[in-house]
């Protein structure tokens, strides 16, 4: 059965904990823009200014991050993404860190930044939810620094991928030259080649021309055990 607008809003991270009356007030005062998309349609582009909140209410999203020096491209499949980079609505860098498009037909709900500031931030629950979203992002970044106490080459590769990922869930596709990856993680090309082949032998990733694919990086990280370093 199709969800009502109240039910859809209550599922969104920013509105969790609101009463039916509070949701009704949001709908009465805040303009909600709905847009339908086809598979392959782009939602926002990397570097584009974040001018509001964009919620994914239907469909599967793909995110693409391109290094500013064109050394690599990371594509993530994000079937459970609910909102696109709400933490970049404020702060010093108010632009999207990557491009987002639909891998299927989809639908978004957008709320302009002016509406967020004027109406939504006046609600204490919404302000707390926004703080939680921002704090969670910061804490994820901090935890990454302590993920592997003693970095082997394989661990450096995993940390590199996670450092540029939105989520630990979903498939990650990396387009990168072996020499570029070696330079980024401060290893030799030979060490990187050996490490990638070991990871493939263990079923953690699949090597392909110009890069590799990891189907489940969360499982890969959780299952990872230290290997003998090839330094």
Predicted feature residues:
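Cyclic nucleotide-binding regulatory module and flanking cytosolic helices
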Residues: 1-34, 38-39, 83-84, 88-91, ...
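Short, small/polar residue-rich loop motifs at catalytic or cofactor-binding pockets
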Residues: 29-30, 48-50
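Cyclic-nucleotide recognition modules
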Residues: 30, 74-132
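A cytosolic small-molecule/anion-sensing beta-strand core signal
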Residues: 38-39, 57-58, 79, 104
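Short phosphate-coordinating micro-motif centered on Lys-Gly-acidic
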Residues: 39-48
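Glycine- and acidic-residue-biased ligand/ion/polar-headgroup-sensing regions
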Residues: 51-64, 80-81
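Polybasic "coupling" helices that flank or enter modular domains
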Residues: 121-189
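Phosphate-/nucleic-acid-contacting segments
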Residues: 162-231
